[in-house]
Amino acid sequence: KKSTNHKSKFKIAGVEFGGDLIPIFAGPNMVESKDLILDVAKNIRQIGAHFLRGGAFKPLTFPYRSKKYNETREDGIKWLGIAKEKYDIPVITEVMEEKFLPMICEVADILQIGSRNMQNYPLITAAAKTKKPLMIKRHYGSSLRDWLGAAEYALVEGNEKILLCERGVSVPHTHRSTSRFLLDLQVVPAAQEMTHLPIVVDPSHATFWRPWIKSMSLASVACGADGIMLEVHPDPENSAVDPLQPIDFKSFKKLMKQLASIAPIVGRTI
């Protein structure tokens, strides 16, 4: 365990974390179809995203599925691989069960441990043993101490390429009846006082509300985030999952320009 005076720097698929660059993860919540993920990969790569995100395996709050929902699972992983190769963009996707690790590791550059599995220590341990970089999302009811403890389960396996991702906490008041979480930007500097690991912020899941994505993304840069994860979809209102939170390509392009303009103020780049 390194001193907190030290900040880890490492590269994943040629992209540096922990330095001046603030890498951007972008893509749909769910890999809905081959055509959709190829369209997204093409556009976000052209706009400047560093990683393609998309879930082939999706944990939902309720087991009920809308007519639009189709968990693509093995096919989704295959389509992510096709998009990765065609548009030369690295991939992050969630792993929910240990048995799917070999298949997912063939495609993913980063394994995402979702918030609901933040304290699934056997899963974290198994994922860490693959030596693939991990992103561990903070559970919406967990303390900073719990979150860092989850990361330690990966670190003790000798896997030092660990990203931590803040994606909102559950509080009594979230400013909108449709919002479930509050983005805890205070945790970014707080975590940086206690850990050497890079801190990524996910404003999309935290706000659950498209109009707030811009301001919370800009604020994430201002507070010292080491990466930003954004939900981007070609037709947000018809997204199969969480249609209130994705932004479209035009909005993403505009936001990327705004992020690039303010990053130098805090000594960073996009």
Task: Give the ranges of each region predicted by the language model.
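N-terminal amphipathic alpha-helix/helix-capping segment at the start of soluble metabolic enzymes
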Residues: 1-25, 266-270
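Catalytic alpha/beta core domains of metabolic enzymes, predominantly
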Residues: 12, 17, 130-232
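Active-site mouth loops of central-metabolism enzymes
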Residues: 21-39, 62-70, 90-94, 114-115, ...
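Catalytic domains of carbohydrate-active enzymes, especially glycoside hydrolases
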Residues: 39-56
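Catalytic beta/alpha-barrel core
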Residues: 53, 70-72, 88-100, 109-122, ...
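Glycine-rich, proline-tolerant flexible connector loops at the mouths of alpha/beta enzymes
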Residues: 53-75, 234-244
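Alpha-helix-loop-beta-strand connector modules within alpha/beta enzyme cores
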Residues: 66-93, 127-133, 185-199, 245-268
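C-terminal alpha-helical cap/extension of soluble enzyme domains
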Residues: 208-209, 213-270
